[in-house]
A protein has these predicted regions:
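Pocket-lining segment of extracytoplasmic ligand-binding domains
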Residues: 86-87, 95-105, 112, 125-130, ...
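Sec/Tat signal peptide C-region and signal peptidase I cleavage site
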Residues: 19-23
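Bacterial N-terminal signal peptides
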Residues: 8-17
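An extracytoplasmic/periplasmic, membrane-proximal ligand-sensing/linker region
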Residues: 177, 194-215, 225-227, 268-339
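Ligand-binding clefts/hinges and TM-proximal coupling segments of bilobed small-molecule sensing domains
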Residues: 134-135, 140-159, 230-299
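Bacterial N-terminal signal peptides that target proteins for export
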Residues: 1-8
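Extracytoplasmic small-molecule ligand-binding "clamshell" domains
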Residues: 41-76, 82, 245-247, 338
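Bilobed "Venus flytrap"/periplasmic-binding protein-like clamshell domains
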Residues: 25-53, 57-60, 121-184, 194-195, ...
């Protein structure tokens, strides 16, 4: 009897230890863009929701100099999740531009797990210069802040400028000084952008409080050239900027952004995470209008994002399962599911 009691005690201790390990909270270090950016704001809201709804995880939003720094951090095993765009994944897969030489040394491949919104990119100028600049090519030779060096929005605008032959003088400045520099005439133009065609970045809102900027749209000929070379063009409502930007419609170049967690989170948990996001989409959109596209049609956003990046990075099995259940998975992508 004594041995039996001792055995029960040992088994009980083992079970207590196992239960402790099962209930252990897993930390997720999630990289995003800099404080003041749309990506940082969005991830802060997303992780707040996930921390509440997934108590077995502890999500932390970590600001980086730019989204690609988070992609590189994940690929080198320093982060558990990243903030990545289809344009960045293209550069990574092609071993070019900001990722030139990086592919050979990375330790793991980023994966697609949650496409969040589109980002739409364009140009702003001072309102007093509206008669001076009529199209993007008029900025050739001018001082233009196209965004911080690591940022994907800058890469998108620079690629468009290169396509159009815009040979501007790139000026790197602190985001907090853009408005004053434009007001003083020390820069002639700057990057503007929106998220989900519904909101803009905090730093752009702050810029509008310091100076009176106008949107500079590409000309009809420039739009034609951009479309012929693979760019999409979308029309954004100027009311997003909460001020007059002196155009009836804003012509922007969209691309896709996602908050992508790696294979350390198993299929079942990513699937659960996506269902939580879908269920709470209205709450997310209320806290940040950047989630408007998720609220409107999360399934469509996942399909569009996957279509844009399927050739460059694989898909998390949790996202693949979720998309299959929604009837939006294409069987030709089966070989692109991450293992």
């Amino acid at each position: 009897m004594k041995k039996y009691v001792q055995l029960l005690i040992v088994v009980g201790l083992l079970l207590m230890g196992a239960t402790g390990s099962w209930s252990q909270v897993k930390d997720i270090k999630w990289g995003t863009s800099a404080v003041g950016s749309s990506g940082y704001r969005a991830l802060v809201n997303l992780t707040a929701l996930l921390n509440r709804e997934m108590p077995d995880y502890r999500f932390t939003a970590l600001p980086m100099p730019g989204a690609i720094v988070s992609v590189k951090g994940y690929a080198m095993g320093k982060l558990d999740a990243c903030y990545g765009a289809d344009s960045a994944f293209y550069e990574l897969a092609s071993n070019i531009n900001r990722f030139k030489g990086f592919k050979a040394k990375m330790k793991r491949q980023p994966v697609q797990s949650f496409w969040t919104f589109t980002v739409e990119v364009g140009v702003g100028i001072h309102s007093r210069d509206r008669g001076k600049y009529r199209q993007w090519r008029d900025l050739s030779g001018k001082r233009v802040f196209t965004g911080p060096l690591p940022w994907d929005v800058r890469a998108q605008l620079e690629r468009a400028f290169q396509t159009l032959g815009v040979k501007h003088k790139y000026v790197e400045v602190d985001l907090a000084t853009v408005g004053s520099l434009l007001e003083q005439g020390r820069i002639d133009g700057f990057i503007t952008y929106t998220n989900a065609e519904a909101t803009t970045a905090p730093w752009i809102i702050e810029t509008s409080l310091v100076t009176d900027f106008a949107i500079l749209n590409p000309s009809e000929q420039e739009v034609k050239i951009l479309k012929q070379t693979g760019f999409s063009i979308t029309e954004v409502d100027p009311k997003i900027f909460k001020k007059s930007v002196y155009v009836d419609k804003v012509l922007y170049l969209p691309f896709y952004y996602g908050f992508n967690i790696g294979l350390d989170m198993p299929e079942a948990d990513v699937y659960r995470m996506l269902n939580i996001i879908e269920k709470k989409a209205a709450e997310l959109a209320k806290s940040d209008a950047g989630f408007a596209q998720i609220k409107a049609d999360m399934a469509a956003m996942q399909r569009k994002g996957v279509e844009a990046a399927i050739e460059y990075v694989p898909v998390h099995p949790g996202l693949a399962k979720w998309m299959r259940e929604k009837g939006i998975w294409d069987s030709k992508w089966d070989s692109r599911i991450a293992k």
